Amino acid sequence: MVVLDGKKLSQEIKAELKTKVEQYKQEIQKVPGLTVIIVGEDPASQVYVRNKAKSCNEIGMASEVIELPASTSQEELLKKIADLNHNPNVHGILVQQPLPKHIDEFAVTLAIAPEKDVDGFHPENVGRLVLGHLDKCFVSCTPFGIIEILKRYNIETKGKHCVIVGRSNIVGKPMANLMVQKLAYMNCTVTVCHSATPDIATYTKQADILIAAIGKARFITGDMIKAGAVVIDVGINRIEATNTKSGYRLVGDVDFEAASQKASAITPVPGGVGPMTISMLLANTMKSFEHFLA
């Protein structure tokens, strides 16, 4: 059984990107720039934003975090995004979600220029993904990271049955649209399960590749997994743990111990898909930078 080490892979990707950033810095005195906007003081969002800025700094990318109060109006936020759209030193724009209730998240997504939408949420990028123009769009970072895991571990996907549990716009839907593409490390027969699917285990037991992204701790048990399946666990859930300093620990949507007995390969939580998501955000920012150079 192979543990698919996303932490190690993400370090490799960062090292590759760092080399590229240094080359551009020497040759043209320019580096990619990512700007992250955070509205309000959600503690989890603040941690994510800090991690993104730290990762940019590690590889020499320019990064800026714009912190706005929770009282910021939608109009003010859209004006800030418009300014960044026109700033030639900004190649990636990301607005950290969730946003305060009075701000329409879809209006914010639409406001970001598609060519700077490194999160891959703009309808133009989603449409290009569905049509298979992956070279001409930004792919949502978590699904992009999963493809990169499959690729770097050389996991055969062609003709395999891929079952995705979850249908979010961030993971489930883009993942399904990727896995049906006639491309290497995709090209699967795809089934999507969700909250209205009766007896999810019927489907998960048929999966050659099982991707769990529902946000329910250890929802996928060992008896729901086919022997020899590749299991990708996207979930990050806090559960109580009296023996830790914080009083909790992180687990995925899959019961790792039980699944390990059945799977041929599995991503751990933490250290699997999570670190890859941030590395792919950096990769998308580099792609945007190179697009603007061209």
UniProtKB/Swiss-Prot annotation:
Lineage of the organism: Bacteria, Pseudomonadati, Chlorobiota, Chlorobiia, Chlorobiales
Key words, A-Z: Amino-acid biosynthesis, Histidine biosynthesis, Hydrolase, Methionine biosynthesis, Multifunctional enzyme, NADP, One-carbon metabolism, Oxidoreductase, Purine biosynthesis
EC code: 1.5.1.5, 3.5.4.9
Q: Does the keyword Amino-acid biosynthesis apply?
A: yes
Binding, NADP(+)? 166-168, 195, 236
Per the record, what are the reactions this protein catalyses?
(6R)-5,10-methylene-5,6,7,8-tetrahydrofolate + NADP(+) = (6R)-5,10-methenyltetrahydrofolate + NADPH; (6R)-5,10-methenyltetrahydrofolate + H2O = (6R)-10-formyltetrahydrofolate + H(+)
Pathway, per Swiss-Prot/TrEMBL? One-carbon metabolism; tetrahydrofolate interconversion
Report the record's Gene Ontology biological process terms: L-histidine biosynthetic process; methionine biosynthetic process; purine nucleotide biosynthetic process; tetrahydrofolate interconversion
Species this chain originates from: Chloroherpeton thalassium (strain ATCC 35110 / GB-78)
Q: InterPro entries per the record?
A: Aminoacid_DH-like_N_sf, NAD(P)-bd_dom_sf, THF_DH/CycHdrlase, THF_DH/CycHdrlase_cat_dom, THF_DH/CycHdrlase_CS, THF_DH/CycHdrlase_NAD-bd_dom
What the record says about family reads: Belongs to the tetrahydrofolate dehydrogenase/cyclohydrolase family.
UniProt cross-references to Gene3D superfamilies, sorted A to Z: Leucine Dehydrogenase, chain A, domain 1, NAD(P)-binding Rossmann-like Domain
Which Gene Ontology CC terms are recorded?
A: cytosol
Protein encoded by which gene: folD
Question: What interactions and quaternary structure are annotated?
Answer: Homodimer.
Q: What is this protein called?
A: Bifunctional protein FolD
**What does this chain do?**
Catalyzes the oxidation of 5,10-methylenetetrahydrofolate to 5,10-methenyltetrahydrofolate and then the hydrolysis of 5,10-methenyltetrahydrofolate to 10-formyltetrahydrofolate.
